[in-house]
Amino acid sequence: MQWTTPSYTDLRFGFEITMYIANR
């Protein structure tokens, strides 16, 4: 799965940060 959509990348990045903070 390789999406080059900036919005998708931003969403995925934000999701990763959210999960990181939630797993702290």
From Swiss-Prot:
Pyrroloquinoline quinone (Glu-Tyr) cross-link site: 16-20
- Does the entry annotate any disulfide bonds, and if so which pairs? none
Keywords carried by this UniProt record: PQQ biosynthesis
Name the InterPro entries on file: PQQ_synth_PqqA (IPR011725)
What Pfam families does UniProt report for this protein, alphabetically? PqqA
The Gene Ontology biological process annotation of the record reads: pyrroloquinoline quinone biosynthetic process
Q: In which pathway does it act?
A: Cofactor biosynthesis; pyrroloquinoline quinone biosynthesis
Q: Does the keyword Transferase apply?
A: no
What does this chain do? Required for coenzyme pyrroloquinoline quinone (PQQ) biosynthesis. PQQ is probably formed by cross-linking a specific glutamate to a specific tyrosine residue and excising these residues from the peptide.
Q: Which HAMAP family match?
A: PQQ_syn_PqqA
Q: Which family does it belong to?
A: Belongs to the PqqA family.
- The protein depicted here goes by the name Coenzyme PQQ synthesis protein A
Q: Which source organism?
A: Burkholderia cenocepacia (strain ATCC BAA-245 / DSM 16553 / LMG 16656 / NCTC 13227 / J2315 / CF5610)
